From Swiss-Prot:
GO terms for cellular component: cytoplasm; protein-DNA complex. It comes from Cupriavidus pinatubonensis (strain JMP 134 / LMG 1197) (Cupriavidus necator (strain JMP 134)). Does not seem to be involved in the regulation of 3-chlorocatechol degradation. Does not activate the expression of its presumed target operon, tfdCDEF. The gene is tfdT. This is HTH-type transcriptional regulator TfdT. The keyword Nucleotide-binding does not apply. The lineage of its organism: Bacteria, Pseudomonadati, Pseudomonadota, Betaproteobacteria, Burkholderiales. GO terms for molecular function: DNA binding; DNA-binding transcription factor activity.
Amino acid sequence: MEIRQLKYFVAVAEAGGFGTAAQRMHISQPPLTRQIQALERDIGAKLFERTARGVELTAAGKVFLDDARQLLALVQRSSRRSQAAARGESGELKLVYFGTPVFETVPAFVRTFLATYPDATVAVSHMTKEAQLESLLSGVVDIGFGRFYPVTEGVSSWNIGTETLHVAAADPWDTRVSRARAVVDLLDVPLILYPRGDRPSFADKVVSIFRDRFKKSPGGLLTFSASC
């Protein structure tokens, strides 16, 4: 049984005759007839009955028509997926993240990616920035999301968004912080930051805001354990 035989069979069934089917398939009628006969021999059943107006499906032909259409659809789908894989549009995208991008940036990216490449899948996992860079260079992962990546040979990075930086405070600093209208108003307020892990880090960025603008560090720096 060949794929072209299935196509010929479906064409004859839909056209209701060999002549019309041959025209639609752009072949002469004798080769079409021979292929249908060969298909009937392979199946071991007659698929068409000749009538005054053309041909009609036999009981076996009606059953086989549904299967033939499904087989052809499967072949077409497999061909499309293989072509997509060859173009890099299917398979699994290994995505890693660190920090707040998991809340909005990563979900938005995954939705857009899957809408563009419906035959692909995305595996998402958490990974520190240092581990991300190592995994990207070794080919273990495909793409990483985070903040403040250091310049690394062999890895390309882009700024894809910004985040608003907020200040939270409790007694005895809440009144002073709530009245602050600029970064300079916070110079003497102790800051509690994430530990300085992978460099550059979020803590480095916050401290640099003060140092770059005012040539002065905040009034005090405290860090809390990442396990808290």
